[in-house]
Amino acid sequence: ALADDGESTKINTNIYEGLVKYADDSTEIVPCLAESWDVSDDGLSYTFHLRQGVKFHDGTDFNAEAVKINYDRQLPGNATENMSYAGFIFGSVKDIVVDDDYTVTINLTEAQTPFLANLAMVQGSPIVSPKALEDNNNDVTQAPCGTGPYKFVRWDVEQDVILERNEDYWGEPAKTKNVIFKIIKDNSARVIALNNGEADIIDGVDSNVVD
């Protein structure tokens, strides 16, 4: 679920969401799985009021306990070495308190001005289905399960990753039914795939292979 490279992040951001996010083409912080939030006067406590009626892709409920489970595992002393952003985002977090089913408070050890901005980086703070974490021994690499507009279908290593539209998504439905992320390492081969109609979009192409 946690990504530290650009290509994986492009996939993860379709599957997972965080409490807050960046507005399109902007650095403004806007609601996502949290509808609103309050910050204490001393900047040490962030209380998030969560969106109700949201389901994970496996049909389980998104709630405050799910947030706590996800964030607790990234706190200092709990984070594993594959959690590249844990120290950056959660290093100053003291604890996470479930106030009620849809309210959660994050307490900090010291005020951190960019805390919300850091939390908006979904690649480092995705909300994963607690059931999926439990069922897969905390490794959902092969079975990612979030609340996002697309659901994971398959990952064929070195070939492609296939996602399908989440028909039960709480927000605006995705416009495309399926998305296939093809893994084509060679720059020239990516350009050929685009020109042949085998790909709709490509990226990471060097200028010297484009006419």
Language-model region placement:
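Sec-exported extracytoplasmic/periplasmic mature domains
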Residues: 20, 24, 55, 72-79, ...
